[in-house]
Structures are given as C-alpha cells and as structure tokens.
Amino acid sequence: MSDKRQCGVLLPVSSLPSKYGIGCFSKSAYDFVDALKVAGQSCWQILPLGPTSYGDSPYQSFSTFAGNPYFISLEDLIEEGVLTQKECDAVDFGSDPASVDYAKLYKGRIILLRKAYERSNVGENEEFRRFQEEEAWWLKDYALFMAVKQRFEGKPWSEWAEDIRLRWQNALDYYRRELYFEIEFQEYMQFKFRQQWMKLKAYANKQGIEIIGDIPIYVAMDSADTWANPWLFKLD
C-alpha cells in the first residue's frame, strides 16, 4: 500500500446486494467498486473469505486457504450456461433481504453449485486440472476433509472413525476412491471461487481500488488444516 493517507470503506462481501441470499462476486461487487472510485475512495476492506463453519462466522473457518463457496456468483454460472435463471429463481433463499438465512442458503446454494459442477465437464477442463496441480498442497486435504465431513453428517473430525480421524493411509486411500466425485465437487467450487475472486480483484485494482483483506487470528480446531497437520498443534 502507499505511504500516503488513503480512504476507503469496510463492506463484507456478504453484505453486497443480492437476490440469491447473500452478497457475492456478482455485478453488485463490480458496481460497488465503481461507486468507490466515483466517491474518491481508494480502499475496499473486507472480512475473511474462508468457508464458514458453525455459527457462520468468517472468523471460524474450515480452512485457512480455501474460499467460501457462498461467494460464487450464480449470475456468472448462468452466463456460462451451467445454470438457468429459472433454476436459481426457484430456490428459497429466505424472505428477509436485510439478513442472511444461512440454513436456507446452505441447502439451496449447494444444490445449485452441484448442478453447475455436474454440467461443467471439469474433467476436460485444462484450466481446472492446472488449478488442481498448482494448489494441491492445500486443496487435496481440504477437499477430502469436506467430503468426509459430509459422509459423517457434519461431525467435527475429532468424532470421525478412528482410521480416518488419525489419517491412516489405508483410510485415506479408501475415502479418496469412495468419495471421488464429492472431492472433485469441492475442488470445483474452489476453482470457481478463485476464478471469480481474481477477476473481481483485478477489476478493482484497475480502477485504483486496493483490497484490504482479513484472516482469522487462529486456525479452527475443526478445520482441514488441523486435521491434516496435527503435529503443528497441541491437541488432547
């Protein structure tokens, strides 16, 4: 950042206007960047972008490195042809435009994102494969963690079966085979998040707007980071 004084606005991505339950990387985000520029501002401060866990707080995340799938723009997926306007409009995201109904958001948005994944034919997408390779150092553990968490009905990893809780190699191999498509779905959501976020960030920077990010102070106990790297933490 510049040594000169700067002025900006703190606005969580989730607070941007949206008819699909939560603010995201849609046209509203670009409109906000334009509004900042017109107002003579030079900074946009946001809250952490990680996938939220229990309590839906951005400061308690399932991963230090992953992005929140809720922020993926459904409008962009409609433009890509992997979702339809009718499908998105048919989902109940809640009736209060001033607040986020996370229960309905989780149910509805994940269903739509899964449809987009199934229609995307990511296996033939070279950009997706390159993303998998370049981000494998965190992505493989995160995607497996989220897939196994779903298999165990959302329970924290400390309550999973012993073999996968302790990451025995035979268990890791088994779940990677058994949950292949769910793992790929998790990776697809991270791919779309990264793609859309970098596009928005590049646009903001081109308009002279810098992004001030934020991260949680601590790594969450129930996270892919802790599960995959237990030797880095003091665990009971």
PLM feature spans:
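Acidic/aromatic-lined carbohydrate-recognition and catalytic surfaces
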Residues: 2-230
